[in-house]
């Protein structure tokens, strides 16, 4: 069954709270002059004239964007004139996107503009003073809250509105639109204009006529003046920022840091926790930062990156997160990223800029730290001032989103291999137990914890009991107030097929909705997210994959179609609503059958001691004990052989490397089977020139004229790295000498020490993995218990139903994150069943050919597939999922008893 793995999006920053009903501007001291534009405006080829749209005063940035007029707007004021009551800054529209899927083109939007490019282009970046007041006569206007469709409230007068240089009026936690990217200064300038050949022809004739009349030369002169003004202002902006950075280096005072914040980001003050974290980092103190989703955690490493002399290395779990964070770097910070999704030439270019000192912030995945060549650059020449561990809860096996690759992010490695001077660990959701584990691993003192409330107070939380008609219940909810008036809604599901099914159902009922999950092509995911951000889509029905890089502050509601897997997941996902500070609504549909199904799936990563023992025996086999031999484990075949998921095998191998005893050293994962075809020179000729080619000929077998060989075996035979072998055959390919294909993805490692007792090590690992499995189940039980309590409390108080449920859930969330998450939570799973053992006995007798373990039988009875017992085969038996309501451990115990009896009976029959 397809479902998306949990992922955090806590780096996504949010708009600071705004007043619900902003005022109209005060009196205008001196009216602005209307000046004809300098630049030419394209006209339609149609002979019919259209009425012009009426002129309006400058809009309030917090007000909802108006519906574009079908008529062309009036000519905008020229940017050459400086006597306007405000300045117009060129900014990129939120709806700007590229519809391509390639990594390089996705990343191209994230690139920054250098000073030299500013000087040559002159239009990519228009720096302006950060704050300019707009003065206008007082006027009472109707305003709509950004997250509502309709509203009828008249705005009372308040203080003057301030325009910021980022051009969008939002707070400093959603969009840093100073990256110098080319965009339209007037987005609707050419709207409605014909793009036909005749239109361009007419424009060209008109321009030539003006040149003939002497007007063309005047226009060119004025455009040249505009170019010079832009260059001067850009140089002035950069000079001001450099002065502010120098002032902070001299004295990291609150005043100097706030001035730098204002210049680069355009905001007057820091949010709670930001300034404290920045000052600790600049002081060289490793810090643990826990801020709510959307509270601006990324700013806490961006400002230090400007000040500190070395590189800031940001470790992030997903490529999509890295691309988003790179895209939102301000133009003054030069950034880059390294990912396995890049083409070789892209990675080479990034490494070149890194070595030349061009890049200040580098985004990498934790797997990159396995690359010996990458680490050697930092040991030899590059200086790392700060290592940022984003989504730091992934370090802890007790978190809701444990990732084995994060286990290698230990302070000892970061300080020794990268020579890091300071560590910043960031997360939005972490319990006390998780924080202790993360801070211990990264050696962050307990006094260096900055933790703010993990739940904002502008939510109305609610839960309802649902069943087979959940889709109908969802439709009824969305067609009732206040949801029917909310402009942007996210609906979270657990399974990929649900997103497509529910979004289609909503569209059939005239609700503009789209499904989103990790199985969609990258370009489709980008298009859906950007359409949602620009309000072209009202509802996104998504798995937990949605939310990374979400740049939208006015999401008005989050609806959970199923119970989340943990409190952390729930808080993280509802945190994507209400980032503009307005009241937002979060509803959860609780269904007991779905809860039991998710509880069964929580056991899918568990393993038996027998399977762990077989796995360790293979890892430490006689063939692998040779000194410095590069060993490999083909993932697909090993997964079926040991009935383990890829993630579980990776967890065990990582623990063998980073545990109390280092038994092995992990190497980069790669496709180990290479099929090589020689084209120009003969194999023997190339072998005479290259030791690697000679080793390939010795270690390969010829099949239909093709040489098939194992890359680790070739590398071990001549004592070189696997990357050297790959580099050699790639170089031959570039010369046209060979072509090759790679297959069989495998874990690669080198044995450093063999365990004395496999059984003892197997028992230790099984106990550790069982605790992780139990922790996952317990988190689901706690979330389920909180939802049920909120349902039951709705009829026991004089408060309104919404207020009662909100208080109940808030109380549970507070207790969970500030207490011990190991607190007992009753499970709804049945602890015994009269017919269970009888059915297991029948099941074993009817499937004598299979080799079962107690866990394999329990999974089948719960309707959960595994690598050795896939859904496609075993879902056909009538025992599949029959005992989903019975506790998994109870079934395992019954299965173990029946397996012993079954073996004894077979042995007796054999004798």
From Swiss-Prot:
Alphabetical UniProt keywords: ATP-binding, DNA-binding, Helicase, Hydrolase, Isomerase, Nucleotide-binding, Nucleus
Induction of synthesis: Repressed by drought.
Catalytic activity: Couples ATP hydrolysis with the unwinding of duplex DNA by translocating in the 3'-5' direction; ATP + H2O = ADP + phosphate + H(+)
PROSITE patterns named among the record's database cross-references: DEAH_ATP_HELICASE, HELICASE_ATP_BIND_1, HELICASE_CTER
Top EC category: isomerase
Listed SMART domains: DEXDc, HELICc
The keyword Nucleotide-binding belongs to this UniProt entry's keyword annotation: yes
Region listing for Disordered, in residue ranges: 1-84
A Gene Ontology cellular-component term: nucleus
An annotated Gene Ontology molecular function: ATP hydrolysis activity
Sequence motif DEAH box, location on chain: 390-393
PANTHER family: ATP-DEPENDENT DNA HELICASE Q4, DNA HELICASE RECQ FAMILY MEMBER
Described function: 3'-5' DNA helicase that may play a role in the repair of DNA.
Name the record gives this protein: ATP-dependent DNA helicase Q-like 5
Lineage start: Eukaryota, Viridiplantae, Streptophyta, Embryophyta, Tracheophyta
Gene name as annotated: RECQL5
């Amino acid at each position: 069954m397809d479902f998306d793995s949990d992922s955090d999006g806590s780096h996504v920053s949010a708009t600071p709270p705004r007043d619900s009903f902003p005022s109209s501007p005060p009196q205008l001291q001196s009216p602005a002059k209307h000046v004809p534009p300098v630049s030419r405006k394209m006209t339609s080829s149609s002979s019919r004239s259209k009425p012009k749209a009426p002129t309006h005063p400058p809009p309030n940035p917090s007000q909802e964007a108006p519906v574009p007029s079908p008529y062309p707007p009036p000519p905008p004021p020229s940017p050459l004139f400086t006597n306007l009551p405000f300045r117009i800054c060129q900014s990129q529209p939120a709806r700007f996107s590229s519809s391509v899927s390639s990594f390089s083109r996705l990343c191209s939007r994230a690139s920054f503009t250098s000073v030299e490019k500013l000087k040559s282009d002159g239009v990519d970046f228009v720096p302006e003073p950060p704050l300019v007041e707009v003065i206008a006569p007082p006027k009472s206007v109707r305003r709509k809250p950004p997250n509502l469709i309709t509203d009828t409230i008249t705005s009372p007068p308040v203080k003057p509105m301030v325009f910021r240089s980022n051009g969008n009026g939002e707070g400093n936690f959603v969009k840093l639109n100073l990256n110098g990217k080319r965009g339209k200064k007037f987005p609707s300038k050419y709207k409605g204009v014909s793009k036909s050949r005749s239109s361009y022809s007419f424009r060209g004739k008109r321009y030539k006529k003006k040149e003939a009349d002497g007007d063309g030369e005047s226009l060119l002169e004025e455009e040249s003046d505009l170019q010079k003004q832009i260059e001067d202002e850009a140089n002035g902006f950069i000079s001001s920022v450099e002065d502010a950075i120098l002032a902070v280096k001299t004295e990291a005072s609150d005043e100097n840091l706030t001035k730098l914040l204002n210049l680069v980001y355009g905001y007057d003050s820091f949010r709670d926790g930001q300034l404290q974290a920045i000052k600790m980092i600049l002081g060289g103190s490793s810090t643990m930062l826990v801020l709510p989703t959307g509270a601006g955690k990324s700013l806490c490493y961006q400002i230090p990156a400007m000040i500190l002399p070395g590189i800031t290395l940001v470790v992030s779990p997903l490529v999509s997160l890295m691309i988003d964070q790179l895209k939102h770097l301000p133009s003054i910070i030069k950034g880059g990223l390294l990912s396995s999704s890049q083409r070789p030439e892209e990675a080479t270019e990034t490494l070149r800029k890194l070595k030349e000192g061009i890049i200040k912030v580098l985004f990498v995945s934790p797997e990159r730290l396995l690359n010996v060549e990458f680490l050697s650059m930092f040991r030899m020449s590059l200086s790392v001032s700060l290592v940022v561990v984003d989504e730091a809860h992934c370090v802890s096996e007790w978190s809701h989103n444990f990732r084995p690759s994060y286990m290698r992010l230990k302070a000892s490695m970061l300080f020794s291999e990268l020579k890091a001077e300071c560590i910043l660990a960031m997360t939005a959701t972490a319990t006390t137990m998780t924080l202790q584990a993360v801070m211990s691993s990264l050696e962050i003192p307990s006094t260096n914890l900055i933790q703010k409330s993990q739940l904002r107070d502008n939510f109305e939380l609610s839960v309802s009991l649902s069943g087979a008609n959940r889709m109908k219940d969802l439709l009824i909810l969305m067609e009732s107030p206040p949801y029917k008036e909310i402009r942007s809604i996210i609906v979270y599901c657990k399974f990929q097929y649900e997103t497509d099914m529910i979004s289609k159902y909503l569209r059939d009922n005239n609700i503009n909705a789209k499904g989103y999950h990790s199985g969609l092509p990258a370009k489709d995911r980008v298009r859906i997210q950007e359409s949602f951000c620009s309000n072209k889509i009202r509802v996104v029905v998504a798995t937990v994959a949605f939310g990374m890089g979400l740049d939208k502050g006015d999401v008005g509601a989050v609806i959970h179609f199923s119970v989340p897997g943990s409190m952390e997941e729930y808080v993280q996902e509802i945190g994507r609503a209400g980032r503009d500070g307005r009241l937002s609504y979060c509803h959860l549909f609780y269904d007991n059958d779905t809860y039991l199904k998710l509880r069964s799936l929580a056991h899918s990563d568990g393993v038996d001691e027998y399977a762990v023992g077989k796995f360790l025996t293979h890892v430490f086999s006689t063939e692998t004990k040779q000194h410095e031999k590069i060993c490999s484990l083909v993932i697909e075949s090993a997964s079926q052989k040991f009935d383990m998921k890829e993630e579980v095998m990776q967890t065990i191998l990582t623990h063998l490397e980073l545990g109390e005893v280092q038994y092995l050293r992990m190497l980069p994962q790669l496709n180990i089977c290479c099929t090589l075809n020689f084209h120009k020179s003969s194999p023997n000729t190339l072998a005479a020139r290259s030791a690697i080619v000679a080793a390939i000929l010795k270690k390969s077998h010829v099949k239909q004229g093709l040489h098939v060989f194992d890359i680790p075996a070739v590398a071990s035979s001549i004592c070189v790295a696997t990357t050297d072998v790959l580099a050699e055959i790639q170089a031959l390919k570039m010369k046209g000498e060979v072509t090759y294909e790679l297959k069989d993805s495998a874990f690669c490692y080198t044995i450093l020490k063999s365990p004395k007792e496999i059984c003892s090590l197997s028992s230790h690992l099984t106990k550790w993995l069982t605790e992780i499995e139990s922790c996952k189940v317990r988190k689901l039980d706690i979330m389920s218990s909180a939802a049920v309590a909120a349902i039951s409390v709705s009829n026991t108080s004089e408060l309104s139903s919404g207020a009662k449920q909100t208080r109940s859930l808030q109380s549970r969330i507070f207790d969970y994150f500030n207490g011990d998450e190991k607190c007992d939570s009753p499970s709804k799973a049945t602890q015994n069943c009269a017919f269970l053992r009888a059915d297991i006995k029948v099941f074993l007798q009817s499937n004598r050919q299979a080799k079962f373990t107690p866990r394999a039988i329990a999974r089948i009875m719960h309707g959960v597939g595994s690598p050795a017992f896939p859904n496609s085969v075993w879902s056909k038996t009538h025992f599949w999922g029959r005992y989903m309501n019975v506790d998994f451990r109870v079934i395992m115990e019954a299965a173990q008893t029946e397996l012993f009896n079954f073996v004894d009976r077979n042995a007796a029959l054999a004798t």
